[in-house]
């Protein structure tokens, strides 16, 4: 209230009396403060609550994935897999799941986590033994993350399923497949080879990305869980959470029913059972190891291993 800033041009004067007449609520507030000994203050409009913002998710450059998908000759897990299922099949799997090779530990495996929208959420680097295919845990556990190795400041990692990018495939073959979820990335790859009628995903650990937010990508899908031995009860407790999103959910107890006490104590998973019987590729690899000339013979005549189970 008071004189207009442009009084010299308009001559208008808005008096305090007129202001309080037009704004009785302000007058009442000031009078109340004076009655209780308060100092009159100018009325302020109520503060607006700021909308809650979700923490920003960091992504890795997609070209890092492409750059890593080479030098498989030094990748111990790749070399192990070629003995299990053959080079051609491994090449297809590593391309489908976008598995890479790192310079760390002489060629460690990089399991890239790419979400359904094509964003690269994370890259897990893990060391494997080329002979056994097992993780290297001695003299230290060979596991790291790409963003840590690259020293990316303020990187906010939010994991997704390993293999989640396959859910964006709208082809009739992939989109109609039931989704099978296991714990480890290596298990997902092995199962994808032997049981291709499922789309195999991995949580990346007992808990990993197994949470309410991450499972939203499974909306409307038929999902079956294949937990490691000893984790069946814990994973079965996740069913109500999945049932609120998925069209149908099941937690397989197949391994629990067929496992021995020793196997159960070892916490084996479905991949361990799939590899219990030697594949033709594994038998051939042992034959070549005993007689390297056999590989030269195969290469010279372009021989291929025929699956006896195929007609």
Question: Where is each model-derived feature located?
Answer:
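Short, exposed beta-strand "edge-strand" segments with a Pro/Gly-rich flavor and a Y/T-containing core
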Residues: 82-83, 152-169, 258-268, 272
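TOPRIM fold recognition
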Residues: 3, 13, 116, 176-179, ...
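Non-catalytic accessory segments of DNA primases and related replication-initiation nucleases
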Residues: 1-108, 130-150, 220, 230-231, ...
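Phosphate-handling DNA/RNA-contact segment within nucleic-acid enzymes
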Residues: 110-219
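Surface-exposed flexible segments
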Residues: 14-25, 121-128, 194-195, 240
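Intrinsic-disorder-associated interaction segments
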Residues: 58, 70, 150-155, 263, ...
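Intrinsically disordered, low-complexity segments enriched in small/polar residues
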Residues: 9, 30, 35-36, 84, ...
């Amino acid at each position: 209230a008071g004189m207009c800033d442009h009084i010299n041009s308009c001559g208008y004067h808005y008096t305090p009396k007129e202001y309080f007449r037009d704004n009785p609520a302000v007058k009442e507030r000031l009078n109340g403060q004076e009655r209780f000994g308060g100092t009159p203050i100018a009325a302020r409009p109520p503060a607006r609550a700021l909308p809650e913002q979700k923490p920003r998710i960091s992504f890795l450059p997609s070209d890092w994935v492409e750059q890593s998908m080479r030098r498989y000759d030094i990748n111990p897990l790749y070399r192990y897999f070629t003995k299990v299922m053959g080079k051609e099949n491994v090449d297809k799997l590593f391309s489908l799941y976008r598995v890479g090779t790192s310079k760390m530990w002489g060629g460690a495996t990089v399991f890239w986590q790419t979400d359904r929208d094509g964003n690269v959420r994370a890259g897990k680097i893990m060391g494997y033994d080329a002979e056994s295919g097992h993780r290297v845990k001695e003299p230290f556990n060979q596991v790291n993350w790409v963003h840590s190795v690259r020293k990316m400041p303020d990187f906010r990692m939010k994991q997704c399923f390993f293999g989640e990018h396959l859910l964006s495939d709208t082809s009739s073959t992939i989109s109609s497949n039931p989704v099978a979820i296991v714990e480890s990335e290596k298990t997902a790859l092995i199962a994808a080879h032997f049981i291709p009628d499922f789309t195999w995903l991995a949580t990346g650990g007992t808990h990993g990305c197994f949470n309410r937010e991450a499972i939203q990508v499974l909306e409307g899908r038929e999902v079956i869980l294949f937990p490691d031995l000893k984790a069946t009860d814990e994973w079965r407790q996740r069913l109500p959470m999945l049932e609120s999103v998925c069209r149908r959910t099941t937690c397989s107890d197949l391994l629990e029913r067929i496992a021995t006490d020793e196997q159960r104590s070892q916490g084996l998973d479905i991949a361990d059972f799939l590899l219990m019987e030697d594949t033709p590729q594994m038998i051939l690899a042992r034959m070549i190891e005993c007689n390297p000339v056999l590989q030269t013979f195969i290469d010279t005549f372009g021989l291929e291993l025929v699956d006896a189970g195929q007609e």
